[in-house]
Amino acid sequence: MSSSKRKRGAETAAEDCDDGTDKSNTGNSFFDIYGPEAKAELDFKSPETTLNLQDVQGLVTWVLAEGFMPSWVFIKNKPLIPKVVLLYLPGLDAALYLSHSKTLSSLKSCCGNPMALLALSCVVDEMRTIDTILTCKGRKKKTVTSSVEPPPLVSSPEACNLMGKSFVELTKDIPFPVSYYTLSQKEMEQNGYTFEKLELTPTLPAPSGSCPPEIVALDCEMCITKEGLELTRVTLVDIQGQVLLDKLVMPTNPITDYNTRYSGITAVMMEGVTTTLKDIQEEFLKLVFKETILVGHSLENDLLSLKISHNLVIDTAVLYKHPHGRSYKTKLRILAKKFLAREIQESESGHDSAEDAKAAMDLALLKIKHGPDFGSPPEVIRKKLLAVLNESGKTTSIIDNINIVKRYASESSNAIPVSSDDEALSKAVKEVKNKRSQFVWTQFSELNAHFQSRADDPQKLNSRLAEMISLLTCNKKSGLKKSNVSPETKEILKKMNERVQSLYAALPTNAMFIVCTGHGDTSIVHRVRKMLKDEDEIGFDREKLVKVLEELQAQAEVALCFVGIKQ
């Protein structure tokens, strides 16, 4: 059967769902249509496809609500599916599953081979994974009372060239004052501008009677020394695009890596450079005063490398909001291409701080000229997945800890708080057998809680890190894949397997069973990141610990999704 015929057949079947029959008798009606031997089946179009969390949510809304047909799986006889059970297993990444697939045999026996699932970054809160699955997002519909259409995006370099004009000309008849776009104290704290905790030199008030520049853009480049990244180039440009300052700086410590790919700095360029950090600070403070608005992209890094504090900042990484929220920031190169039709950071010789500073200034001026809504992603509305399913006439149950139940249950959901995996299994089995419940969510969290407890125990943490460093040192190719698993972890995996089997056994025929692991052991990732940040805590070679972190993070971000239909 061709994919187009499959789609038409599925759509026809979906239309039959809305014929006004009683929802509780829908299954019997469809068995009358398809015959007593009919069964729902899955056809994975591309088993090698890597899914994301939205794909998992999309599968649920396609089966139970008015979602879109997934591109990665075809469901034969979809109307025969009486319910969907979604089980969340945090902590189980692909590597752990593959190394203990025999212990976790029920997953394959129930659902077949898993598909790779790209987890969210380990940097974000673990709750974001659940939020991504249990919260549906859509663009807000425009209404008659909506504000005026935002200006079109710039399509050519000439159209966006705001440089060459004075501050007065550029700020004439603007929607909001320039100060509106500077970071608030809270925003500075949220984005790493923690000046008060460090010994930094503050910018000073302008001398009486002087005319300090109203707004300037800053960009710095760094090379790597034994102490990490250190300042090697400072560039300031004014509102007209003129370079006010552009100097190379000799780091305090010897350079170990010129970081040319990103910094654009080479050994030849640094020959004969005698300007010190103190020298460049003095020059900087003669151009940037307390009243000056400083523009840049992720300026907290530049100011920290300069060891200067300044509280009047327009940060284009914050100014242009990322579609996925505050935890993400769009790269300057992408913003320049999208809003300025300008290619930057393309040279093989590395970044150009003057080019980057001008791009940041142009982006800030565009926002100032057109207003705060310019360049903002479409307004998104968030609805609970369970509410979306309820609106489609489906009855839902959520079985989880009290915080998750309170946060994601809809007004019509059967909300069941539990405090252990055994209790979650018991309640889930009951709901699965309830013919009126068409969607059931639950999670088994013992493995993830075990990882959290282990990461919080200094002795266990240090022992595990020592083992990992040893593995990396002895066999770089094998990475951490052969790391030993403790008897306690094995026992938890065994119990997880038994619970999965018990839950599956309770499913009615043709029920869809989705098992999503979400992420691996992020607890140890967060702990190691903190150790590297608080250098006094490190009891290992820093370079080796960084390599361990890279391995841990890469492993934790490859999760799995199992999908099966009870036969």
Curated annotation (Swiss-Prot):
<dbReference type="InterPro" id="IPR012337">
    <property type="entry name" value="RNaseH-like_sf"/>
</dbReference>
<keyword id="KW-0269">Exonuclease</keyword>
<dbReference type="InterPro" id="IPR036397">
    <property type="entry name" value="RNaseH_sf"/>
</dbReference>
<keyword id="KW-0540">Nuclease</keyword>
<feature type="region of interest" description="Disordered">
    <location>
        <begin position="1"/>
        <end position="24"/>
    </location>
</feature>
<dbReference type="Pfam" id="PF00929">
    <property type="entry name" value="RNase_T"/>
</dbReference>
<protein>
    <recommendedName>
        <fullName>Small RNA degrading nuclease 5</fullName>
        <ecNumber>3.1.-.-</ecNumber>
    </recommendedName>
</protein>
<dbReference type="InterPro" id="IPR034922">
    <property type="entry name" value="REX1-like_exo"/>
</dbReference>
<dbReference type="InterPro" id="IPR047021">
    <property type="entry name" value="REXO1/3/4-like"/>
</dbReference>
<feature type="domain" description="Exonuclease">
    <location>
        <begin position="215"/>
        <end position="364"/>
    </location>
</feature>
<dbReference type="GO" id="GO:0003676">
    <property type="term" value="F:nucleic acid binding"/>
</dbReference>
<dbReference type="GO" id="GO:0004527">
    <property type="term" value="F:exonuclease activity"/>
</dbReference>
<dbReference type="InterPro" id="IPR013520">
    <property type="entry name" value="Exonuclease_RNaseT/DNA_pol3"/>
</dbReference>
<comment type="similarity">
    <text>Belongs to the REXO1/REXO3 family.</text>
</comment>
<keyword id="KW-0378">Hydrolase</keyword>
<dbReference type="GO" id="GO:0005634">
    <property type="term" value="C:nucleus"/>
</dbReference>
<comment type="function">
    <text>Probable 3'-5' exonuclease degrading single-stranded small RNAs.</text>
</comment>
<keyword id="KW-0539">Nucleus</keyword>
